[in-house]
């Protein structure tokens, strides 16, 4: 069996949930004529391929972390394709959850990079400093995402990608999400490892 089939057979609920929200938000994007849909779908396919590779090479990735990744994907698709319920912006990413302080955009970036930090720390669990590796690699994921979005925005009219200030806030929330994940794993352990329930880790991976 291929690595993708192995992963799908191991986590059918996550696969169905992912298929469901991808289908829903694809329809939403088509109905609303959101051109960025044709950027999101290939990016999502590439992201799934990376997850499958990590699962095959360093897995199996714990199901709870796969759920977090799927939820992040759904939040991201909703943010770029669904409308802002307040009517102030064209897409959900512009929706202020707490006026002047927290937008949907901030929440998605923080949650997503936090989830990526946990997955990458799990992948680096056999290294001397898994939490540091998870933190650093997750920031790389964030930078790649921001770079790709801004490059594509140069060629896609009406992409709704923000300006430099928005990008700076995205990076700040990447740091916040990763720090929250690292602090949580410092106290509770890396999910899916032998210390995930039985002990805590310091930043260098030593048992406390």
Regions found by a protein language model. Name each.
Residues 163-180:
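Membrane-interface transmembrane-helix boundary segments in multi-pass integral membrane proteins
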